[in-house]
């Protein structure tokens, strides 16, 4: 059964471009070989961590949004667990697609100039 997932991966902040491209290729290859559908792979950049992980105070965040089955998520997490460059990862099954609520604009009441002067 195909389900929707999103995964956030935190890697070491000092990786070079070749290593980052290799990590991106690894994730896309796993999803492709397990017959998944990759929707989004975003680099969120280097951010400060809430607490040090492996003596590192910063980490590079990646967001991956894909469709797949349970075998795909198990294989992806297994490969991420074995990679020394990955500090942490978290995969979540998306139950419902939620759209951002439209911002409500309250009408601004302006007092007439005559009333404001009194």
Curated annotation (Swiss-Prot):
Alphabetically ordered keywords of this record: Ribonucleoprotein, Ribosomal protein, RNA-binding, rRNA-binding
GO CC annotations on file: cytosolic small ribosomal subunit
Residues spanning the membrane: none
A GO BP annotation: translation
Biased amino acid composition, Low complexity: 99-118
HAMAP family the UniProt entry points to: Ribosomal_bS6 (MF_00360)
The protein, known as: Small ribosomal subunit protein bS6
Organism: Geobacter metallireducens (strain ATCC 53774 / DSM 7210 / GS-15)
